[in-house]
Protein backbone atom coordinates (compact mmCIF):
# COMPACT_ATOMS: atom_id res chain seq x y z
CA UNK A 1 0.00 0.00 0.00
CA UNK A 2 1.54 3.30 -1.13
CA UNK A 3 1.78 6.40 1.01
CA UNK A 4 -0.77 8.16 -1.23
CA UNK A 5 -3.24 5.27 -1.41
CA UNK A 6 -6.84 6.46 -1.58
CA UNK A 7 -5.86 9.98 -2.59
CA UNK A 8 -6.35 11.94 -5.81
CA UNK A 9 -3.79 14.28 -7.39
CA UNK A 10 -4.59 17.08 -9.85
CA UNK A 11 -1.63 17.94 -12.12
CA UNK A 12 -1.31 20.58 -14.85
CA UNK A 13 1.17 20.44 -17.72
CA UNK A 14 1.32 16.67 -17.54
CA UNK A 15 1.65 15.59 -21.17
CA UNK A 16 5.40 15.10 -20.91
CA UNK A 17 8.52 16.15 -19.02
CA UNK A 18 8.22 16.95 -15.34
CA UNK A 19 4.42 16.85 -15.36
CA UNK A 20 4.33 13.33 -16.77
CA UNK A 21 6.98 12.24 -14.29
CA UNK A 22 4.99 13.70 -11.38
CA UNK A 23 1.85 11.90 -12.54
CA UNK A 24 3.62 8.55 -12.78
CA UNK A 25 5.38 8.92 -9.42
CA UNK A 26 2.24 9.93 -7.53
CA UNK A 27 0.39 7.03 -9.17
CA UNK A 28 3.18 4.66 -8.13
CA UNK A 29 2.64 5.93 -4.59
CA UNK A 30 -1.05 5.02 -4.83
CA UNK A 31 -2.86 8.16 -6.00
CA UNK A 32 -5.44 8.37 -8.75
CA UNK A 33 -4.47 11.07 -11.22
CA UNK A 34 -6.17 13.99 -12.93
CA UNK A 35 -3.84 15.44 -15.55
CA UNK A 36 -4.20 18.25 -18.06
CA UNK A 37 -2.10 19.90 -20.74
CA UNK A 38 -2.64 22.47 -23.46
CA UNK A 39 -1.46 19.93 -26.08
CA UNK A 40 -0.67 22.55 -28.67
CA UNK A 41 1.11 25.81 -29.36
CA UNK A 42 1.29 28.73 -26.93
CA UNK A 43 2.08 32.15 -28.37
CA UNK A 44 5.66 33.19 -27.66
CA UNK A 45 6.69 29.83 -26.23
CA UNK A 46 10.05 28.59 -27.51
CA UNK A 47 9.70 25.07 -26.13
CA UNK A 48 8.55 22.32 -28.48
CA UNK A 49 4.76 22.01 -28.36
CA UNK A 50 3.16 19.15 -26.47
CA UNK A 51 0.62 17.03 -28.36
CA UNK A 52 -2.56 15.06 -27.65
CA UNK A 53 -0.50 11.92 -28.23
CA UNK A 54 1.86 12.99 -25.45
CA UNK A 55 -1.07 13.29 -23.04
CA UNK A 56 -2.40 9.90 -24.12
CA UNK A 57 1.00 8.38 -23.39
CA UNK A 58 0.96 9.87 -19.90
CA UNK A 59 -2.45 8.29 -19.34
CA UNK A 60 -1.17 4.93 -20.55
CA UNK A 61 1.81 5.05 -18.22
CA UNK A 62 -0.37 5.98 -15.25
CA UNK A 63 -2.75 3.12 -16.01
CA UNK A 64 0.21 0.75 -16.04
CA UNK A 65 0.65 1.48 -12.32
CA UNK A 66 -2.87 0.21 -11.68
CA UNK A 67 -4.28 3.63 -10.80
CA UNK A 68 -7.17 5.46 -12.42
CA UNK A 69 -6.58 8.53 -14.56
CA UNK A 70 -8.65 11.37 -16.01
CA UNK A 71 -7.04 13.45 -18.76
CA UNK A 72 -8.14 16.55 -20.60
CA UNK A 73 -6.69 19.11 -22.98
CA UNK A 74 -6.88 22.35 -21.00
CA UNK A 75 -5.05 25.66 -21.26
CA UNK A 76 -4.30 26.95 -17.74
CA UNK A 77 -5.11 30.45 -18.98
CA UNK A 78 -8.73 29.28 -19.27
CA UNK A 79 -10.14 29.36 -15.73
CA UNK A 80 -13.57 28.01 -16.65
CA UNK A 81 -12.02 24.98 -18.38
CA UNK A 82 -9.89 24.23 -15.32
CA UNK A 83 -12.92 24.58 -13.05
CA UNK A 84 -14.87 22.21 -15.27
CA UNK A 85 -12.07 19.64 -15.07
CA UNK A 86 -11.86 19.97 -11.28
CA UNK A 87 -15.63 19.54 -10.99
CA UNK A 88 -15.55 16.47 -13.23
CA UNK A 89 -12.66 15.03 -11.22
CA UNK A 90 -14.69 15.36 -8.03
CA UNK A 91 -17.67 13.71 -9.73
CA UNK A 92 -15.55 10.81 -11.00
CA UNK A 93 -13.20 10.23 -8.05
CA UNK A 94 -15.14 11.76 -5.16
CA UNK A 95 -12.21 13.65 -3.66
CA UNK A 96 -9.12 15.75 -4.27
CA UNK A 97 -6.05 15.76 -2.04
CA UNK A 98 -2.99 16.96 -3.95
CA UNK A 99 -2.62 19.79 -6.46
CA UNK A 100 0.54 20.16 -8.55
CA UNK A 101 0.63 23.43 -10.52
CA UNK A 102 3.28 22.43 -13.03
CA UNK A 103 2.30 23.91 -16.41
CA UNK A 104 4.84 26.36 -17.77
CA UNK A 105 6.43 27.82 -20.89
CA UNK A 106 9.80 29.43 -21.59
CA UNK A 107 11.14 32.04 -23.97
CA UNK A 108 14.30 34.11 -23.88
CA UNK A 109 15.63 37.46 -24.90
CA UNK A 110 17.18 40.58 -23.47
CA UNK A 111 14.73 42.42 -21.23
CA UNK A 112 14.62 45.62 -23.29
CA UNK A 113 13.92 43.65 -26.46
CA UNK A 114 10.96 41.59 -25.21
CA UNK A 115 7.63 42.50 -26.77
CA UNK A 116 4.52 43.06 -24.68
CA UNK A 117 3.00 39.94 -26.24
CA UNK A 118 6.03 37.82 -25.27
CA UNK A 119 5.90 39.19 -21.73
CA UNK A 120 2.17 38.61 -21.41
CA UNK A 121 2.26 35.05 -22.75
CA UNK A 122 4.84 33.82 -20.23
CA UNK A 123 3.24 35.68 -17.31
CA UNK A 124 -0.24 34.42 -18.25
CA UNK A 125 0.83 30.77 -18.29
CA UNK A 126 3.51 30.65 -15.60
CA UNK A 127 1.90 32.96 -13.03
CA UNK A 128 -1.77 33.51 -13.81
CA UNK A 129 -2.03 29.82 -14.74
CA UNK A 130 -0.90 28.94 -11.22
CA UNK A 131 -3.57 31.23 -9.77
CA UNK A 132 -6.21 29.66 -12.03
CA UNK A 133 -5.16 26.17 -10.91
CA UNK A 134 -5.53 27.23 -7.29
CA UNK A 135 -8.85 28.95 -7.97
CA UNK A 136 -10.23 25.82 -9.63
CA UNK A 137 -9.08 23.27 -7.04
CA UNK A 138 -8.69 24.80 -3.59
CA UNK A 139 -12.44 25.27 -2.98
CA UNK A 140 -12.82 21.49 -3.33
CA UNK A 141 -10.04 20.85 -0.81
CA UNK A 142 -11.61 23.27 1.67
CA UNK A 143 -15.11 21.81 1.25
CA UNK A 144 -13.74 18.29 1.63
CA UNK A 145 -12.39 19.24 5.05
CA UNK A 146 -9.54 16.73 5.15
CA UNK A 147 -6.54 18.96 4.54
CA UNK A 148 -4.36 18.59 1.48
CA UNK A 149 -1.13 19.54 -0.24
CA UNK A 150 -0.71 22.21 -2.90
CA UNK A 151 2.65 22.04 -4.70
CA UNK A 152 3.71 24.88 -6.96
CA UNK A 153 6.50 24.18 -9.44
CA UNK A 154 8.69 27.27 -9.59
CA UNK A 155 12.36 27.26 -10.63
CA UNK A 156 15.80 28.23 -9.44
CA UNK A 157 14.91 31.36 -11.43
CA UNK A 158 12.30 32.02 -8.75
CA UNK A 159 15.03 32.42 -6.13
CA UNK A 160 17.76 34.28 -8.02
CA UNK A 161 18.21 36.89 -10.74
CA UNK A 162 18.34 34.69 -13.81
CA UNK A 163 19.16 36.80 -16.89
CA UNK A 164 17.74 36.67 -20.43
CA UNK A 165 14.38 35.33 -19.20
CA UNK A 166 12.99 38.34 -17.34
CA UNK A 167 9.35 37.39 -17.88
CA UNK A 168 10.04 33.80 -16.77
CA UNK A 169 12.10 34.96 -13.79
CA UNK A 170 9.41 37.43 -12.74
CA UNK A 171 6.69 34.79 -13.01
CA UNK A 172 8.66 32.23 -11.01
CA UNK A 173 9.37 34.83 -8.29
CA UNK A 174 5.64 35.53 -8.31
CA UNK A 175 4.95 31.86 -7.66
CA UNK A 176 6.94 32.21 -4.42
CA UNK A 177 4.67 35.07 -3.38
CA UNK A 178 1.61 32.97 -4.14
CA UNK A 179 3.06 30.09 -2.15
CA UNK A 180 3.83 32.10 0.95
CA UNK A 181 0.60 34.08 0.99
CA UNK A 182 -1.61 31.11 0.20
CA UNK A 183 0.08 28.97 2.86
CA UNK A 184 -1.03 31.51 5.47
CA UNK A 185 -4.57 31.63 4.11
CA UNK A 186 -5.01 27.85 3.97
CA UNK A 187 -3.29 26.95 7.22
CA UNK A 188 -6.55 26.96 9.18
CA UNK A 189 -7.85 24.25 6.83
CA UNK A 190 -4.75 22.05 7.30
CA UNK A 191 -3.90 22.55 3.64
CA UNK A 192 -0.17 22.89 3.03
CA UNK A 193 1.34 24.99 0.25
CA UNK A 194 4.97 24.68 -0.85
CA UNK A 195 7.03 25.55 -3.91
CA UNK A 196 9.68 23.42 -5.62
CA UNK A 197 12.62 25.05 -7.41
CA UNK A 198 14.31 22.81 -10.01
CA UNK A 199 17.36 23.58 -12.10
CA UNK A 200 18.79 21.82 -15.13
CA UNK A 201 16.07 19.21 -15.66
CA UNK A 202 16.42 17.11 -18.82
CA UNK A 203 13.17 18.03 -20.58
CA UNK A 204 12.22 19.89 -23.76
CA UNK A 205 12.65 23.14 -21.83
CA UNK A 206 16.42 22.59 -21.80
CA UNK A 207 16.40 22.50 -25.60
CA UNK A 208 15.25 26.08 -26.18
CA UNK A 209 17.28 27.28 -29.20
CA UNK A 210 19.67 30.16 -28.70
CA UNK A 211 19.41 30.55 -24.92
CA UNK A 212 22.53 28.59 -24.04
CA UNK A 213 24.48 30.34 -26.78
CA UNK A 214 23.61 33.70 -25.25
CA UNK A 215 24.59 32.46 -21.78
CA UNK A 216 27.93 31.20 -23.08
CA UNK A 217 28.63 34.51 -24.78
CA UNK A 218 28.19 36.27 -21.43
CA UNK A 219 29.98 33.60 -19.40
CA UNK A 220 32.76 35.93 -18.28
CA UNK A 221 30.38 38.21 -16.38
CA UNK A 222 27.29 36.05 -15.80
CA UNK A 223 28.71 32.52 -15.68
CA UNK A 224 28.74 32.27 -11.86
CA UNK A 225 24.95 32.70 -11.79
CA UNK A 226 24.63 29.34 -13.54
CA UNK A 227 27.29 27.48 -11.55
CA UNK A 228 26.28 24.50 -9.43
CA UNK A 229 27.70 23.54 -6.05
CA UNK A 230 27.40 19.81 -6.71
CA UNK A 231 29.40 18.34 -9.63
CA UNK A 232 26.42 17.78 -11.95
CA UNK A 233 24.95 19.70 -14.88
CA UNK A 234 21.50 18.19 -15.27
CA UNK A 235 19.03 15.80 -13.67
CA UNK A 236 16.05 13.67 -14.66
CA UNK A 237 12.43 14.75 -14.11
CA UNK A 238 12.10 11.85 -11.68
CA UNK A 239 14.52 13.62 -9.35
CA UNK A 240 12.04 16.48 -9.02
CA UNK A 241 9.13 14.06 -8.72
CA UNK A 242 10.72 12.50 -5.64
CA UNK A 243 10.43 15.87 -3.88
CA UNK A 244 6.88 16.38 -5.18
CA UNK A 245 5.86 12.95 -3.87
CA UNK A 246 7.39 13.72 -0.47
CA UNK A 247 5.55 17.06 -0.22
CA UNK A 248 2.32 15.34 -1.26
CA UNK A 249 2.64 12.76 1.51
CA UNK A 250 2.12 12.85 5.26
CA UNK A 251 5.91 12.63 5.61
CA UNK A 252 5.84 16.41 4.98
CA UNK A 253 2.69 17.08 7.01
CA UNK A 254 4.24 19.87 9.07
CA UNK A 255 5.88 21.71 6.17
CA UNK A 256 4.12 24.69 4.60
CA UNK A 257 5.12 27.97 3.02
CA UNK A 258 8.53 26.53 2.15
CA UNK A 259 10.68 26.95 -0.94
CA UNK A 260 12.46 23.66 -1.70
CA UNK A 261 15.40 23.96 -4.14
CA UNK A 262 16.30 20.81 -6.09
CA UNK A 263 19.09 22.50 -7.97
CA UNK A 264 22.57 21.08 -7.28
CA UNK A 265 23.05 24.01 -4.88
CA UNK A 266 22.96 26.68 -7.59
CA UNK A 267 20.76 28.91 -5.42
CA UNK A 268 23.37 28.64 -2.68
CA UNK A 269 25.88 30.47 -4.88
Regions found by a protein language model. Name each.
Residues 2-93, 107, 211:
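Short-chain dehydrogenase/reductase
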Residues 43-50, 188, 200-229, 239:
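A glycine/serine/threonine-rich, flexible loop-to-helix segment
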Residues 187, 192, 255-257:
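Short, small/polar-rich loop/turn modules that mediate ligand/substrate recognition or access, typified
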Residues 110-111, 118-123, 225:
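Substrate-binding pocket helix/loop in short-chain dehydrogenase/reductase
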Residues 160, 231, 245, 256-269:
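Short C-terminal tail/terminal secondary-structure segment
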Residues 155:
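Residue(s) in the substrate-gating loop at a strand-loop-helix junction
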Residues 134, 171, 179:
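Active-site helix of classical SDR
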Amino acid sequence: MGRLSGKVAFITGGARGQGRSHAIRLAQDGADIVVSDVCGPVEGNMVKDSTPEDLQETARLVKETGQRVLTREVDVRDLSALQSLADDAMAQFGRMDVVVANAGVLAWGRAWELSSDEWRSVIDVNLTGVFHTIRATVPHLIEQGQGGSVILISSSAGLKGQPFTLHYTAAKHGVVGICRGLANELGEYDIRVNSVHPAGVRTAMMEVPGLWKMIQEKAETLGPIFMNTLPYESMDPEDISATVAWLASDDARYITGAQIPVDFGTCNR
